[in-house]
Amino acid sequence: MKMHIARESIVFLLNKHLQNTILTKKIEQECFLQADTPKKYLQYIKPFLINCMTKNITTDLVMKDSKRLEPYIILEMRDIIQMMFFRTLQKHIFFKKNTDLCTEYAQKIEASCYHYTYQQQEKTFLEEYSTRCGTINHIINCEKKSHQQQDNDALNKLISGELKPEQLVGMTFAELCPSAALKEKTEITLRSQQKVAEKTSQLYKCPNCKQRMCTYREVQTRALDEPSTIFCTCKKCGHEFIG
């Protein structure tokens, strides 16, 4: 009961200076959700009260906690991110037909990203948060050019219910996209096994000095069913060219 009264008083004080009821409630609620004790709640809300009274706070720069939430968290950004996830999911016909579920999933994905990045210490909160959201948005995009829609493992699992939206944030790339990860791993393995030993030959003529004293090596830079690329180096002038 005392906590409830304290929260109402803080909202009143903040709004008195901000003159923005929606923003005031967002700030107060965010501080309350992030704090697991009344002491931490007061610790988070204190900078706002001070900034409001000194008129240093604006509606664009709203939240600061010296180390864990630096420099500022733009609360409106969370709404923008949620809308980004919503629009990405809506590209799939399943979510076009299930708008409520699409909204729920977009909110849960964003919330999980927010709480996940809140725990990270190495980077600034905003940098880590926006990076993580961008990665997941790319992964669940069914219109990606990198693969066909049926190969989108993460999106298909979301639709089938096998994967919950809030689970995305804690998964590795290999877990989110096993097909793409396996393909990438296979390509790396094959290329690492290539024979790249240099050989000497007079078959290739240097376009620079016109001599036929070159070393060459074969590298599989394209698909496996296409011929290897021949990289040549002239022993006379050092010019490098493709044979």
From Swiss-Prot:
A zinc finger (TFIIS-type) spans 202-242. Zn(2+) binds at residues 206, 209, 234, 237. InterPro entries: TF_IIS-typ, TFIIS_cen_dom, Znf_TFIIS. Residues 77-201 form the TFIIS central domain. One of its GO terms (biological process) is DNA-templated transcription. One of its GO terms (molecular function) is nucleic acid binding. Pfam families: Zn_ribbon_TFIIS (PF01096). It comes from the Viruses. Keywords: Metal-binding, Transcription, Transcription regulation, Zinc, Zinc-finger. Belongs to the TFS-II family. Putative initiation factor. Necessary for efficient transcription elongation past template-encoded arresting sites. This is Transcription factor TFIIS homolog.
